[in-house]
Amino acid sequence: MTYADKIFKQNIQNILDNGVFSENARPKYKDGQTANSKYVTGSFVTYDLQKGEFPITTLRPIPIKSAIKELMWIYQDQTSELAILEEKYGVKYWGEWGIGDGTIGQRYGATVKKYNIIGKLLDGLAKNPWNRRNIINLWQYEDFEETEGLLPCAFQTMFDVRREQDGQIYLDATLIQRSNDMLVAHHINAMQYVALQMMIAKHFSWKVGKFFYFVNNLHIYDNQFEQANELVKRTASDKEPRLVLNVPDGTNFFDIKPEDFELVDYEPVKPQLKFDLAI
């Protein structure tokens, strides 16, 4: 069992055993019913990528390539236009959160572009990688007031470097997420930001270090308990999957493509489970 599988099972069991139920929840299922959830607060885990600890479960198939395409839509294309996500990358699931004008509102990629977030981050890391102010923050109240739209779930990422005894510089990343659907989105979000960490490390010819993941509200929706129990019972794959970025050191952040990523030794347990999303 991988480290990620162990953490996944522990989190599921913790929510089932110790979680509490939400009240007056905002999300709805497709039939209009309120999507309440059972949740715990303050979930934190460290993945040492140097040791091959990647945050991807083998207990069910996870669409990592689609997740990376979504990440590039946000941080490379820097847009919230659904047509770009759907036509350029073939990713269509964000349509559920459209606001009627072909976008998801002044959110995510549109926020990245408005404040030149990636440009400022790369510039800051280039000038002084040891600066403790190298931060991405998508939580912008001005944007929330400008349009409707889903507020960012994974909203803040902090980057730090450290020089190890081997003389190499390692890039660490800390992802802070306000809310996370444990069964559906947990490993998608985590692997997206590991991919972002890898892209930035390649840009500067650094090594990838540790990935710290904090979720404020970690939940299982009230129509997912059967799937949760199934996942706890499953026997994990004996493989140790890892994500590889096949580009030379020093490759420009904006020149990296989805196909440059390779998921190695990923043999998840099947069949896939079905989930009705809360919107």
UniProtKB/Swiss-Prot annotation:
<feature type="binding site">
    <location>
        <position position="278"/>
    </location>
    <ligand>
        <name>(6R)-5,10-methylene-5,6,7,8-tetrahydrofolate</name>
    </ligand>
</feature>
<dbReference type="InterPro" id="IPR000398">
    <property type="entry name" value="Thymidylate_synthase"/>
</dbReference>
<protein>
    <recommendedName>
        <fullName>Thymidylate synthase</fullName>
        <ecNumber>2.1.1.45</ecNumber>
    </recommendedName>
</protein>
<feature type="binding site" description="in other chain">
    <location>
        <begin position="219"/>
        <end position="221"/>
    </location>
    <ligand>
        <name>dUMP</name>
    </ligand>
</feature>
<dbReference type="InterPro" id="IPR020940">
    <property type="entry name" value="Thymidylate_synthase_AS"/>
</dbReference>
<feature type="binding site">
    <location>
        <begin position="132"/>
        <end position="133"/>
    </location>
    <ligand>
        <name>dUMP</name>
    </ligand>
</feature>
<comment type="pathway">
    <text>Pyrimidine metabolism; dTTP biosynthesis.</text>
</comment>
<dbReference type="GO" id="GO:0006231">
    <property type="term" value="P:dTMP biosynthetic process"/>
</dbReference>
<feature type="binding site">
    <location>
        <position position="181"/>
    </location>
    <ligand>
        <name>(6R)-5,10-methylene-5,6,7,8-tetrahydrofolate</name>
    </ligand>
</feature>
<comment type="similarity">
    <text>Belongs to the thymidylate synthase family. Bacterial-type ThyA subfamily.</text>
</comment>
<dbReference type="GO" id="GO:0005829">
    <property type="term" value="C:cytosol"/>
</dbReference>
<keyword id="KW-0963">Cytoplasm</keyword>
<comment type="subunit">
    <text>Homodimer.</text>
</comment>
<dbReference type="GO" id="GO:0004799">
    <property type="term" value="F:thymidylate synthase activity"/>
</dbReference>
<comment type="function">
    <text>Catalyzes the reductive methylation of 2'-deoxyuridine-5'-monophosphate (dUMP) to 2'-deoxythymidine-5'-monophosphate (dTMP) while utilizing 5,10-methylenetetrahydrofolate (mTHF) as the methyl donor and reductant in the reaction, yielding dihydrofolate (DHF) as a by-product. This enzymatic reaction provides an intracellular de novo source of dTMP, an essential precursor for DNA biosynthesis.</text>
</comment>
<dbReference type="InterPro" id="IPR023451">
    <property type="entry name" value="Thymidate_synth/dCMP_Mease_dom"/>
</dbReference>
<feature type="binding site" description="in other chain">
    <location>
        <position position="189"/>
    </location>
    <ligand>
        <name>dUMP</name>
    </ligand>
</feature>
<dbReference type="InterPro" id="IPR045097">
    <property type="entry name" value="Thymidate_synth/dCMP_Mease"/>
</dbReference>
<dbReference type="GO" id="GO:0006235">
    <property type="term" value="P:dTTP biosynthetic process"/>
</dbReference>
<dbReference type="InterPro" id="IPR036926">
    <property type="entry name" value="Thymidate_synth/dCMP_Mease_sf"/>
</dbReference>
<feature type="active site" description="Nucleophile">
    <location>
        <position position="153"/>
    </location>
</feature>
<dbReference type="GO" id="GO:0032259">
    <property type="term" value="P:methylation"/>
</dbReference>
<keyword id="KW-0808">Transferase</keyword>
<keyword id="KW-0489">Methyltransferase</keyword>
<keyword id="KW-0545">Nucleotide biosynthesis</keyword>
<feature type="binding site" description="in other chain">
    <location>
        <begin position="178"/>
        <end position="181"/>
    </location>
    <ligand>
        <name>dUMP</name>
    </ligand>
</feature>
<dbReference type="Pfam" id="PF00303">
    <property type="entry name" value="Thymidylat_synt"/>
</dbReference>
